[in-house]
């Protein structure tokens, strides 16, 4: 019995992008473009008429903003959406907002030589469309989350950090598709005195700083884009810069950030496998590994290495994942100690830390 191809509707105000995406998608045997629309108002009618499986949506468009349309779509007719974004600071902020509103993932448009650049992205585009077609679509919460800069006692008196012994705990996290929202949910629950956290989220370099700044505005801990050589402090999370590997390193008794321009691993740079291996090598049983929603198997091998080195490891459960790919692979390879729903993970994490003799944390 033949499988029906994935039906894709392209929504983009650029005729060139619509044409290029159509050629890329129609070159695949398992998907087809059933329609195109130059703006959301036309798209609204074509969704009703064509009933597509997946939508590609430009962020910035005339007549109706892409985000306004996405918010209405997710409220009235939730469906998988793949955002198509430019590599600019403004677009990165808007794209992250789109992920908050329920988009499954995004791809970026090249800045120059669009025709050749889009062809180079062809595999990424088609892979992400396949994943989006199977992804769990989540309606965003109706309550708007206001973003206010947090104030702490640091505004009056800076915190003094002691020198840590080699038993200092460290948390390393890997995520991909659906990970921006999973990470936000997890990090918002982190207490201000949590162990240091290193994060590899598959994301282009124009987006990671904006992503870290967004998280920092929401969390009790401090969140920033990682810088080579900086000391890793409790109550801080460090996000891998796009196109650079993030590794855990040591300087005496302290953990520090190491960034590498080494080749892609598991097709990714930054790679979760690279981060997890560095944690296995340099922290061993003092590390906790967490693998979250994402397609593919990046992190599965590294998580097994962490567990074999004595680290404790968590995987996000299938029900709470947008895409149960990376966690599924890590579980299958025997690298996972505990599988947990995303909402339960902070409590279970700190319950385990306290069972190992660490002080109590207020989660």
Curated annotation (Swiss-Prot):
Enzyme class: hydrolase
One Gene Ontology molecular-function label: phosphorelay response regulator activity
Subcellular location: Cytoplasm
Any one cellular-component term (Gene Ontology): cytoplasm
Active-site residues, record numbering mapped to chain: 176, 202, 298
The protein's Enzyme Commission number: 3.1.1.61, 3.5.1.44
Modified residues (4-aspartylphosphate): 58
Keywords: Chemotaxis, Cytoplasm, Hydrolase, Phosphoprotein
Cited CDD domains: CheB_Rec (cd16432), REC_CheB-like (cd17541)
PTM remark: Phosphorylated by CheA. Phosphorylation of the N-terminal regulatory domain activates the methylesterase activity.
Keyword Repeat carried by entry: no
PANTHER family in UniProt: PROTEIN-GLUTAMATE METHYLESTERASE/PROTEIN-GLUTAMINE GLUTAMINASE, PROTEIN-GLUTAMATE METHYLESTERASE_PROTEIN-GLUTAMINE GLUTAMINASE
Protein role: Involved in chemotaxis. Part of a chemotaxis signal transduction system that modulates chemotaxis in response to various stimuli. Catalyzes the demethylation of specific methylglutamate residues introduced into the chemoreceptors (methyl-accepting chemotaxis proteins or MCP) by CheR. Also mediates the irreversible deamidation of specific glutamine residues to glutamic acid.
Record-given protein name: Protein-glutamate methylesterase/protein-glutamine glutaminase 1
Record gene name: cheB1
